[in-house]
């Protein structure tokens, strides 16, 4: 298998990823600004399928209408020259100080109204550029102190905002579903809708739940100590995996945004195995930050590494699934039994079946080994390249 990506692999990057200048809470920028059109061209050369953007990535906050038009024109030229797509867009409701207490859930009503209008304006541009999904990350929606935010009321306001956006895209005839991106903390001390499960439960209460799914990020779930492939499996099970952000994270700490692969390599393997075996058809979107130690050569090497690592893991996962010894080990671990309904004939057949309870020997069942370790070692052998 070739590890050279092509547009058919559907690898996409946010403009804010390769465009990150290396500025953090403890240090100034270590790289200059990148023109979005230049990012488009360089990513196309690497084999990417498309780019994504926040409104403020493409158009500086506060730009005049004429300046806005010029930025969009230059970006379009880059797309037209390269054939790159814009599968997703989102709104920056976190950088400007006006959003210090959030956008959709700010205590200040004027800020909430502005946040909804800012989002609507960028939805129009996203649709114009061909975006098929609109992501919403509420990085400032939360609190640092208990009395500062009535969470139940804040969730009312969050629901109201998403219902307004759903009403807007429906009224405009846009086929642009929303993907809510969970995160437990950072930049706020605690963020609303912190995990995939919280977001899925919230979506059920919206007026048009069919318009909303999730955009989980590797590092965000791992910051909460959760198993990311398990979370993705539940999102797929619910039919709500509308988009995904791929990166790397080493344990429960700040959001590292490593390139995809480093961090928890085993979790990355199981994630790729899941996405490919489940037939996920959406973009493989990288949301990472090239380390501030790197110059621009390092930026492009980091982006290329994201795609290469995915393709290597895809190859290893396919080999794992095709291995006859693995298939036998899966049967020994009773995965085929898990796929069988527990009571296929229903409750009325289960209740009188003495083999299910009265004649069941729990000690004998407890003595049966599950053979999980052998299966897991076969997976590790494939991941580490010890099997063909």
From Swiss-Prot:
InterPro entries: Xyl_isomerase-like_sf, Xyl_isomerase-like_TIM-brl, XylA_actinobac, Xylose_isomerase. Its main location: cytoplasm. SUPFAM superfamilies: Xylose isomerase-like. The active site is at 54, 57. The gene is xylA. HAMAP family: Xylose_isom_A. Its EC number is 5.3.1.5. Co(2+) 1 binds at residues 181, 217, 245, 287. Its cofactor is Co(2+). It is found in: Cytoplasm. Involved in D-xylose catabolism. It catalyses: alpha-D-xylose = alpha-D-xylulofuranose. One of its GO terms (cellular component) is cytoplasm. This is Xylose isomerase. Co(2+) 2 binds at residues 217, 220, 255, 257. One of its GO terms (biological process) is D-xylose metabolic process. NCBIfam families: xylA_Arthro. Homotetramer. PANTHER family: PTHR48408, XYLOSE ISOMERASE (PTHR48408:SF1). Binds 2 cobalt ions per subunit. Keywords: Carbohydrate metabolism, Cobalt, Cytoplasm, Isomerase, Metal-binding, Xylose metabolism. It comes from the Bacteria. It is an enzyme of class 5 (isomerase).
